[in-house]
A protein has these predicted regions:
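Glycine- and charge-rich intrinsically disordered segments
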Residues: 1-11, 261-264, 328-335
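AAA+ P-loop NTPase catalytic core and its hallmark functional loops
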Residues: 1-182
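Glutamate identity and glutamate-enriched acidic tracts
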Residues: 18, 40, 71, 94, ...
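Long, positively charged, glycine-interspersed low-complexity recognition regions
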Residues: 284-335
Length: 335
């Protein structure tokens, strides 16, 4: 099965549409990593419609329609949520959580592009998504004839891509710093708790954090407890603004979590080329190569997403103190 990150999945799906590949497609992956969001974003980018059906919540008659007598025969009136014209994506989400009877009706849509007298219009792509058994999801086995008709893609989490998303959407830099420090907590299913960390739940947790609420209901008690301990360390960091202005050069923290917190905070809060320069020179002089690389990576991610890459490269090449990271920055920005 082809394995992709979220960003690569987006590129793959866009290419499928641009080349008009009408084969049905199945996206596998753990819950909470953004499968549905990617499909929604692709539809928006391609300027086509999206019909998102949670198959696990439908009954067989919901897809097949209602029988209506006509001249001693029964005609089936299809549901109004199925497409009749135009171009778009018919997205059958949670397909393997649906009971076999519903999967059987969905199979007709996928294999034959029709159910009864209803025909899926030519301009529509039929895509599906589902969780895997190893994710502790209540899923049914997919029949072999159905599985064999799909293009199968498996998507996984990627911290660098989540950080890029987090920076674009202004997720609190304490969350980004914490996940730099504890990357395994980006996504960790807890089968004994309804709440656990995932890209989706961190997004929700950020909203709770902004409202001065505990994030336990979003990411779970154990993860939230670690995050609170990290935030206490965050409060002990030296003031960020004087460093960015080049007016202070305090001692670099000795605590590992504080090192992650400070380097990320500098990267996130540096808004101008000069502030980035001051931040990198400070980290280089006080912390050394490892932390300069970490800070440079975060800065590069931010400036690439903000489409200011050239300014960053020019500044680093011009600064003799930072020439050692110039090649790495150019590679990161070109990725």
């Amino acid at each position: 099965m082809k394995k992709l990150t979220i960003n690569n999945l987006s590129k793959y799906l866009n290419s499928i549409i641009e080349h008009n590949i009408q084969s049905s497609l199945m996206i596998w992956g753990a819950p909470g990593i953004g499968k549905s969001s990617v499909v929604e974003a692709v539809a928006k980018k391609q300027n086509i419609d999206l019909i998102d059906l949670r198959i696990s919540q439908l009954a067989p008659t919901d897809l097949r329609g209602i029988p209506v007598p006509a001249e001693n025969k029964a005609s089936w009136y299809p549901p109004d949520f199925l497409p009749t014209a135009g171009k778009g994506i018919l997205f059958l989400d949670e397909i393997n959580m649906a009971p076999p009877a519903v999967q059987g009706i969905a199979q007709q849509l996928i294999l034959d592009r029709k159910v009864g007298s209803y025909q899926v219009p030519d301009g529509w792509f039929i895509w599906s998504a589902g969780n895997r058994k190893e994710d502790f999801a209540a899923v049914f086995d997919m029949p072999a004839p159905l599985a064999n008709r799909f293009i199968h893609l498996e998507v996984s989490t990627n911290l660098d891509e989540f950080k890029e998303y987090a920076l674009k959407t202004e997720i609190d830099d304490k969350i980004i710093s914490f996940l730099n420090f504890r990357p395994k907590l980006l996504h960790k299913i807890d089968k004994n708790s309804p709440s656990w960390p995932s890209p989706r739940s961190w997004d929700i947790g950020n909203k709770l954090l902004n409202a001065n609420l505990d994030i336990d209901p979003a990411v779970g008690e154990a993860c939230a407890s670690e995050f609170r301990s990290f935030c206490k360390i965050y409060k002990t960091l030296p003031s960020i603004e004087p460093i960015l202005k080049g007016k202070a050069s305090p001692k670099f923290p000795s605590d590992l979590s504080a090192k992650y917190a400070l380097t990320c905070a500098l990267a996130v809060r540096a808004k101008t080329v000069k502030e980035v320069e001051n931040a990198l020179v400070y980290v280089d002089s006080k912390a050394g190569a490892e932390w300069l690389t970490q800070c440079t990576y975060d800065v590069s991610t931010i400036w690439r997403s903000n489409k200011k890459a050239e300014q960053l490269v020019d500044m680093i090449i011009a600064n003799k103190k930072l020439i050692k990271v110039a090649e790495n920055v150019q590679k990161l920005l070109a990725a």
